Design a protein with these regions (language model features):
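Short, charged, solvent-exposed linker or helix-capping segments at domain edges/interfaces
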Residues: 50, 101-104, 182-187, 225
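Short acidic-glycine loop/turn motifs at beta-strand connectors
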Residues: 13, 164-166, 217
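Solvent-exposed, acidic/flexible segments
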Residues: 54-56, 72, 107-115, 138-146
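Short beta-strand-centered interaction patches in the first periplasmic/extracellular domains
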Residues: 2, 87-90, 94-99, 129-197, ...
Length: 233
């Protein structure tokens, strides 16, 4: 039987490492830009004699998960909120948390590309463009880099997400389909979907049906009723 194992590392004034956790919930969704992780620590966590919670918003968190000690990297991000109750609940966001704090440069383009916009913004992390396209005239009006990515999504259908590669964050941005070209569905009509040798003639008189119903009364007494054909299914 496999045993779930985990390792949680929190870098604050000190580095805290936990090999046990009550629960971990990681959510990845390119529609929302930001991956999230919610950790619930065990009830009896000891903070080495600290009188107050020694971690805070903005501390880096790394999560590894696996079975029987075979751990795989699962998430890296930053604390956004800390629960006050016991057990401690920690909510984290990936590196998009940092991009929410960096100001976007207000620039104007006559014929912008995704790559050019990202290059000009000096993101502070690596980036890769998939499905590079020209998005025409464009003006950056967003206040933060994260808001800019959201603006690109709404304006040109550009999806963005962050992944960790070689221990470093990398922003992926691009379009899933070419602009102005919707995926086409082709339907064929007049075709048999089932081999006619599999079809069988079935008369209503040959179909045997039996229905069983059980009702639980307020006094916990059960009433059973069967209707239909005695040899029905």
């Amino acid at each position: 039987m496999f045993r779930l194992t985990a390792k949680i590392e929190i870098r604050s004034a000190k580095t805290w490492v936990f090999d046990k956790v009550a629960s971990v919930e990681i959510t990845r969704d390119i529609e929302t830009l930001t991956d999230t992780c919610v950790l619930q620590l065990p009830k009896k966590v000891k903070w080495q004699g600290e009188s107050t919670l020694p971690i805070k918003r903005g501390d880096e968190v790394t999560v590894w998960l696996g079975y029987d000690g075979d751990l795989q990297f699962a998430f890296r991000g930053f604390i956004t909120t800390l629960g006050l109750k016991t057990p401690t609940t920690i909510t984290c966001e990936d590196y998009m948390f940092r991009l929410k704090q960096r100001e976007a440069k207000k620039l104007t383009y006559k014929d912008a590309t995704i790559g050019q916009i990202l290059k000009d913004q000096k993101l502070g992390i690596g980036y890769k463009v998939f499905g590079e396209q020209s998005i025409g005239q464009y003006r950056v009006t967003a206040d933060t880099l994260s808001a800019l990515l959201g603006q690109l999504k709404d304006h040109a259908g550009v999806r963005s997400f962050i992944r960790i590669e070689d221990d470093e964050p990398v922003l992926y941005s691009g379009v899933l389909f070419e602009r102005g070209k919707s995926p086409k569905q082709v339907f064929a009509t007049g075709l048999n979907l089932i081999d006619d040798t599999q079809l069988k003639v079935q008369n209503a008189a040959d179909v045997k049906i039996k229905v069983k119903a059980v009702s639980l009364m307020p006094n916990n007494k059960k009433i059973r009723v069967e209707v239909g054909d005695t040899d029905g299914e």
